[in-house]
Regions:
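Short alpha-helical elements
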Residues: 1-303
Length: 303
C-alpha cells in the first residue's frame, strides 16, 4: 500500500502515459511478434518506471521492480519477472525519447523567454578513472574530457538548449546526445542552429565562431554571446587596453548563462543521471539517460 496522495500521483501519471501512448508513443514500440499485446502493457511499464523514479526515488531497475512487487502489486497484478521487466524496458529507448519530447513541448512554462536561449553540455559517464578502454555501448560512446571535473571519461554528452527563465532554472527546448569526443560547438551547429531563429544564444567560450554567427545574425537573426576568447597573435598593448571591457562583457555573459549549469546540477541531484557505470548495453544507456530526464520532467511538471 502507498499513501493516498501518492495513489493520486500514480493515477495521474498512468492517465498521462495512456494519453501520450495513444497519440504517439505506440508508434515507437510496435511489435510484429505473436506477443504483440502483452498482458503487462507498455503503458503500465512506463508508469511503474516513471512513478518509482519521480516519487519514490528508485532509479535502479531491480529496486523499481522490487518496490512494485511489494507495494504496487494490487495496481499491477500482471507484473512480470525482473528479467522480463528489464528486457521490456530496454526495448523502449525510442518511446522514452519521444515521451521526453512530448513533455518538453506540451508543458513549456509561460515565463520562458523565447528570445533568449542558454546552451551547454554535461557528461554521462559509463567508466572513468584508470579505465583506458570503454567496453559499454561502444556504438555511441567514446573517450572525452570534462573540464569542469578535470577528468577524462568514457561515455556520451547530453547537450541542452534551454529557454531562460527569470529567477529560476531554465526549461529545456532541445536535448541532444552525442559521443563524448564530439566538440560542443560542432554538435550545436549541426543539430540545433537550423531550428533556431530570432534568438540570442548565451554559451561558453567553446561555442565561439565569429564568422559563422556573423552569417546567422544576418539571415536568421540568431546572435551568439560568449565570454571573450584570447585572440591569437594580438599585440600585448591591445590586450592590455581592452582587458577591462572584455572582462566586464565576459562577466555579464556568464551571469546570464550560469542558470543552465543549475539545470544540469538539478537534473543530476534529482536522478543521478551522470553515473551510468552499471549500464551494460547501448539501449540500456539510452534508457538510463532519457528515462532520467523524463523522471525529472515529471517531477517538475506534475508536482
Amino acid at each position: 500500500m502507498i499513501p493516498k496522495e501518492k495513489e493520486l500521483k500514480l493515477i495521474k501519471t498512468y492517465m498521462y502515459i495512456c494519453d501520450v501512448y495513444e497519440s504517439s508513443l505506440k508508434f515507437y514500440c510496435q511489435r510484429f511478434s505473436n506477443n504483440n499485446h502483452p498482458i503487462f502493457t507498455d503503458q503500465e511499464l512506463l508508469t511503474v518506471y516513471l512513478f518509482c523514479g519521480a516519487y519514490q526515488q528508485y532509479f535502479k531497475i531491480k529496486d523499481i521492480h522490487t518496490f512494485t512487487k511489494e507495494y504496487l502489486l494490487s495496481w499491477f497484478p500482471d507484473l512480470p519477472s525482473y528479467q522480463t521487466f528489464n528486457y521490456r524496458l530496454n526495448l523502449m529507448p525510442e518511446a522514452i525519447s519521444e515521451l521526453v519530447r512530448q513533455l518538453i513541448h506540451s508543458f513549456k512554462p509561460q515565463d520562458c523567454d523565447s528570445m533568449k536561449s542558454l546552451v551547454d553540455s554535461m557528461p554521462i559517464i559509463t567508466c572513468a578513472g584508470k579505465n583506458k578502454v570503454g567496453k559499454v555501448a561502444t556504438e555511441i560512446t567514446s573517450k572525452g574530457y570534462c573540464s569542469t571535473k578535470n577528468m577524462y571519461y568514457f561515455g556520451i554528452k547530453l547537450h541542452a538548449v534551454a529557454f531562460r527563465r527569470k529567477g529560476t532554472i531554465p526549461f529545456p527546448e532541445m536535448l541532444i546526445l552525442s559521443a563524448a569526443d564530439e566538440n560542443d560547438s560542432t554538435v550545436f551547429k549541426r543539430e540545433c542552429v537550423g531550428n533556431l531563429n530570432n534568438r540570442e544564444i548565451y554559451a561558453d567560450k567553446i561555442y565561439s565562431d565569429i564568422p559563422f554567427y556573423k552569417e546567422t545574425k544576418e539571415y536568421k537573426k540568431l546572435e551568439l554571446f560568449t565570454p571573450v576568447k584570447a585572440i591569437k597573435g594580438e599585440s600585448p598593448e591591445i590586450t592590455k587596453r581592452e582587458k577591462a571591457a572584455r572582462d566586464l562583457f565576459s562577466t555579464a555573459v556568464s551571469k546570464v548563462r550560469q542558470p543552465i549549469e543549475s539545470l544540469f546540477n538539478w537534473l543530476n541531484e534529482k536522478t543521478n543521471i551522470q553515473r551510468a557505470m552499471k549500464v551494460r548495453s547501448t539501449s540500456g544507456l539510452l534508457v538510463h539517460t532519457m528515462g532520467k530526464i523524463a523522471i525529472a520532467l515529471i517531477t517538475l511538471i506534475f508536482n
